């Protein structure tokens, strides 16, 4: 899929938003990719995940893991296309953990799949879970990389849409200086106790 084609899919799905947003990372931006609005369409979900799975066809993968909430749908479909189990991590008291009986085995080769990467914070937390279990990070795949490839999380990494989007520290955000209303559509605040 070409970059213009992917951007067209986001636009036609109402998933490429402009305004003043607080991202899951805590940074602010004038652009937000609401992947859920794209991934709700089976034809887009299938094609996007086919591209992610294809990017890792030369790597042995035993399992796919995704951070909740945004990565679950794309991770599950990517795992289905690869023919491997899929699990997800989630926050408990602010910490990314495995729950629901999910486990990783030593030496298991794991592909981490996320919807959007900005700073890579959530994926880094999942990498920590994987390595502490003695499993091996086989790669990181995502739908969108807002850093234009500047955030390196694994030796093998693939993003379907890789572009640089302006992000601002909240203390120096020009959108805040203009008193524009702040929208926080991300899922970081969704935690389980």
Swiss-Prot record:
Keywords, sorted A to Z: Glycosyltransferase, Magnesium, Pyrimidine biosynthesis, Transferase
Pathway: Pyrimidine metabolism; UMP biosynthesis via de novo pathway; UMP from orotate: step 1/2
PROSITE patterns documented for this protein: PUR_PYR_PR_TRANSFER (PS00103)
Cofactor(s) it depends on: Mg(2+)
One MF annotation (Gene Ontology) recorded for this entry: magnesium ion binding
Known partners and oligomeric status: Homodimer.
Protein name: Orotate phosphoribosyltransferase
Species name: Chlorobium phaeobacteroides (strain BS1)
């Amino acid at each position: 899929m070409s970059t213009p084609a992917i951007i067209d899919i986001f636009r036609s799905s109402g998933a490429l938003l402009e305004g003043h947003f607080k991202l899951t990372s805590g940074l602010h931006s004038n652009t937000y990719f609401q992947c859920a609005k794209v991934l709700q369409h089976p034809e887009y979900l299938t094609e996007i995940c086919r591209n992610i799975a294809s990017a890792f066809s030369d790597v042995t993968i035993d399992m796919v893991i995704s951070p909740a909430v945004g990565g679950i749908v794309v991770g599950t479909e990517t795992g289905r296309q690869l023919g491997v189990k899929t699990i997800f991590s989630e926050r408990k008291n602010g910490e990314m953990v495995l729950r629901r009986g999910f486990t990783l085995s030593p030496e298991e080769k794991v592909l981490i799949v996320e919807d959007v990467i900005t700073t890579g914070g959530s994926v880094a937390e999942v990498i920590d879970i994987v390595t502490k279990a003695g499993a091996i990070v086989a790669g990181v795949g995502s739908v969108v990389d807002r850093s234009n490839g500047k955030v390196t999380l694994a030796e093998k990494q693939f993003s379907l849409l890789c572009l640089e989007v302006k992000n601002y520290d909240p203390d120096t955000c020009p959108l805040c200086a203009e008193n524009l209303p702040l929208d926080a559509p991300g899922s970081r605040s969704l935690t389980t106790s």
